[in-house]
Amino acid sequence: MKRPDYRTLQALDAVIRERGFERAAQKLCITQSAVSQRIKQLENMFGQPLLVRTVPPRPTEQGQKLLALLRQVELLEEEWLGDEQTGSTPLLLSLAVNADSLATWLLPALAPVLADSPIRLNLQVEDETRTQERLRRGEVVGAVSIQHQALPSCLVDKLGALDYLFVASRPFAERYFPNGVTRSSLLKAPAVAFDHLDDMHQAFLQQNFDLPPGSVPCHIVNSSEAFVQLARQGTTCCMIPHLQIEKELESGELINLTPGLLQRRMLYWHRFAPESRMMRKVTDALLEYGHKVLRQD
């Protein structure tokens, strides 16, 4: 059985994290040549490339598996080293989360863990349809995803659902939808998406108004909080989690343009198995809070 040297694995990890050999060498306090040699040793051991030398570099499928192994080992080391040592060096936890969870329920859920545990969070924001891929590639140790199927050697639990409403300000609605939301009026109403892969708005319009993708004008803004601001100032109509705009809906600052219609996204918490003690704390906190504030039906 091939057993990798974890020092060489850390070199591979550093190249991916730092997005290049030069910065990886600086991070590890060794020469760039030494980084290359360590990765070459790993590749010789496994008889195949572990790194695609693009800009930035990315791991091969085998490289992803080794990085996932490294993440598990780092977490399990925390389990074995004991409270005295781990308390002096905060444990780094890299998690892949969607922007809407980060803007609504995730940070309050993690607050108790952050208050009494020596950890440093590295929250990597990604669309909920793609967060699981970061776990697969070994970039993170946990992920909030819409995928219900667990990856090999991973665990999964249901968190609950975010309900998205199609909203806008009242002046926006009066301008673009004076006779209600119709297929023809939607073609002129500016919308917003998180990125070019965010299809929630398009999917909602296609499902309920038979509008094909790309048929409405759409801004690209990488911020959940900015969605709310754009809607409040009358710039766009957009899909926003109900949990995020309860006050705006109650005050009338925003209105639900399509009562009775919503887009529901069920979320799941994925992580490596077995769980370390610290990851178990994170899991318990996310599940407890998620079950309180997210839809469970």
UniProtKB/Swiss-Prot annotation:
Residues 4-60 form the HTH lysR-type domain. InterPro entries: ArgP, ArgP_gammaproteobact, LTTR, LysR_subst-bd, Tscrpt_reg_HTH_LysR, WH-like_DNA-bd_sf, WH_DNA-bd_sf. It comes from Salmonella dublin (strain CT_02021853). Residues 21-40 bind DNA. NCBIfam families: argP, PRK03635.1, PRK13348.1. Controls the transcription of genes involved in arginine and lysine metabolism. Homodimer. GO terms for molecular function: DNA binding; DNA-binding transcription factor activity. It holds the Pfam family HTH_1. This is HTH-type transcriptional regulator ArgP. Keywords: DNA-binding, Transcription, Transcription regulation. Belongs to the LysR transcriptional regulatory family. SUPFAM superfamilies: Periplasmic binding protein-like II (SSF53850), Winged helix' DNA-binding domain (SSF46785).
